Amino acid sequence: MSNTENKQKRVSVGKDIATRRRVARARRHFRIRKTLRGTPEAPRLVVHRSSRHMHVQIIDDLAGHTLAAASSIEPEVRAVEGDKKAKGAKVGQLIAERAKAAGIEQVVFDRAGYKYHGRVAALADAAREGGLKF
């Protein structure tokens, strides 16, 4: 077998696209988490995005506690008309309100390896407009 045939075999044999994307996101998240730490003064705002819903939590990593949370599964968000970006923005507004109620103004944004685009960006912008400082 020649070297080019061997290269072609390696390219054709492999994981499907969804698995590669999931692994790449996990690697990005690992690289991000090496530097991000949530403290009591500036807890970590972490986003999880599925194909249908978004979940966001404000976490104090030192204590290991979730201080506030919001999700697109909640009835307030389900009632929002529009696309998933609009629902992501509503989740951002909710988390900003709940953070203020808990006395949190400053957060560290953890996009969890997701690209800062679309729903993730809409959530972050809405949280900023709601008064959270990143």
Curated annotation (Swiss-Prot):
Organism: Corynebacterium efficiens (strain DSM 44549 / YS-314 / AJ 12310 / JCM 11189 / NBRC 100395)
Stated family: Belongs to the universal ribosomal protein uL18 family.
KW Mitochondrion (keyword) present: no
GO molecular function: 5S rRNA binding; structural constituent of ribosome
Subunit structure: Part of the 50S ribosomal subunit; part of the 5S rRNA/L5/L18/L25 subcomplex. Contacts the 5S and 23S rRNAs.
Function text: This is one of the proteins that bind and probably mediate the attachment of the 5S RNA into the large ribosomal subunit, where it forms part of the central protuberance.
InterPro entries associated with the record: Ribosomal_uL18_bac-type (IPR004389), Ribosomal_uL18_bac/euk (IPR005484)
Keywords: Ribonucleoprotein, Ribosomal protein, RNA-binding, rRNA-binding
GO biological process, one term: translation
One Gene Ontology cellular component annotation held by this UniProt entry: cytosolic large ribosomal subunit
Gene3D superfamilies documented for this protein: 3.30.420.100
Origin: domain of life: Bacteria
The protein, known as: Large ribosomal subunit protein uL18
One Pfam family linked to the record: Ribosomal_L18p
